[in-house]
From Swiss-Prot:
Localization: Nucleus, Nucleolus
UniProt-recorded name of the protein: U3 small nucleolar ribonucleoprotein protein IMP4
Source species: Rattus norvegicus (Rat)
Pfam families per UniProt: Brix
UniProt subunit comment: Part of the small subunit (SSU) processome, composed of more than 70 proteins and the RNA chaperone small nucleolar RNA (snoRNA) U3. Component of a heterotrimeric complex containing IMP3, IMP4 and MPHOSPH10. Interacts with MPHOSPH10.
Chief site of localization: nucleus
Amino acid sequence: MLRREARLRREYLYRKAREEAQRSVQEKKERVKRALEENQLIPTELRREALALQGSLEFDDAGGEGVTSHVDDEYRWAGVEDPKVMITTSRDPSSRLKMFAKELKLVFPGAQRMNRGRHEVGALVRACKANGVTDLLVVHEHRGTPVGLIVSHLPFGPTAYFTLCNVVMRHDIPDLGTMSEAKPHLITHGFSSRLGKRVSDILRYLFPVPKDDSHRVITFANQDDYISFRHHVYKKTDHRNVELTEVGPRFELKLYMIRLGTLEQEATADVEWRWHPYTNTARKRVFLSAE
């Protein structure tokens, strides 16, 4: 079993490395092609290999855009089989973190919650893989306030790290009633860049395909790289109007890293993307949208 997992992991990493090299060459070709079409100077860093890139452009066509990649392979069963989500917390969780984990369990249809206890991360991931879990969610806290969420897709990754802020739990709102556990419709807004689509896939594939008559709606709305999570149910008051009711919880997500591996491979997995907040242009740039 361990040899098989190691072999599959090596094949996945080799395929990913080849795709990354091919994507880098393709981006260079597109830059040279754009410069020639617009009658502009070829970028300085591409001038040595510009002739070779131009010669290979003759054999390129639009047919390669639909070729599957390691990203497609990670979520190849999305929409075919329902995801199996496991939710746990950091060690020694407070009562409020336990309540937040319980609320997250109700957000994702069919999810299960596991008490962390003294289990190590490696043991958690191995147990999840053995039981067919597709995604492992770990919630972290600071003095009783949830501040971090890790979403690790199994068996090979990726793993996304989010900061949580402005968390409002259902337990904080009196007389809220019960929560619908139907499969929800999803709304994703503002994820127009390549990284944004990647993050959108990581989040939306945590949910199964809904039925047409479901009255439950979950929204992930991106604005200035802060992802607002909202949870509503709706009912039709007449043939034209719809009444929305927020049922909670609500919070904001801020992505700060994506690793190409599972949670226990934190020391060895490659970093696909990392937020650098201390650069001069960090406050001006947005990454999840193309604006």
